[in-house]
Amino acid sequence: MKKNITIYLLLALACLGLQSCLFQEENYFDDSSANRATADVNRCSELLKAAPNGWVMEYYIGKDYSLGGITLLCRFDGQRVTMASQMSEADETVSSLYSVKSEQATMLSFDTYNYLVHYFGQPQGSMSDDPNGTLGGDYEFIISSASAERIELKGKKYGNRIVMKAL
């Protein structure tokens, strides 16, 4: 028994002794992940503000697009977004704060209450089967792709695909 323990200890020490201390990992990217995430946030922020006439947002609600969609006109400026919609009066606009941030991905979030967006994500009581249920609207979106002409978003909670086109 003592002989077996000695053999196992010698084998364990031999395995530890054969391990190399010169492990080097190859870099697949030119920059760190934090720097790439910050650069993507800055790029998306600039794209949102760069459209001179704003954006048309095709905003779909409901689980699996079950409740259809609405059109929102959005103009991003600094940290504020001004919106108009077919739900509001012809000359009425609504302003709120927004942010572009990096969580698990680059995200567009409408931070303060804006009834054109948040209405669909707040509990509706008798309007849904669940008294605490919502109409399936998001107010935080993952930015899937972004260019000067088109930004594709995906709702963080319900996963509906939202498209924004530059005007």
Protein language model features and the residues they cover:
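Acidic/polar, low-complexity intrinsically disordered N-terminal segments immediately downstream
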Residues: L22-M107, A146, Y158
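C-terminal motif of bacterial Sec signal peptides marking the signal peptidase cleavage site
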Residues: L16-S20
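Bacterial N-terminal signal peptides that target proteins for export
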Residues: M1-L9
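Short, exposed beta-strand-loop hairpins at the edges of beta-sheets
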Residues: E152-G155
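Signature of short aromatic-glycine-proline-rich micro-motifs recurring in repeat-based ectodomains
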Residues: I70-L72, L135-E140
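Preference for solvent-exposed, low-hydrophobicity sequence contexts
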Residues: K157-L167
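Contiguous, well-ordered beta-strand patches that form the walls/edges
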Residues: A84-D138
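Helix-rich interaction surfaces within compact, conserved domain-sized segments
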Residues: G133-T134, I143-S145
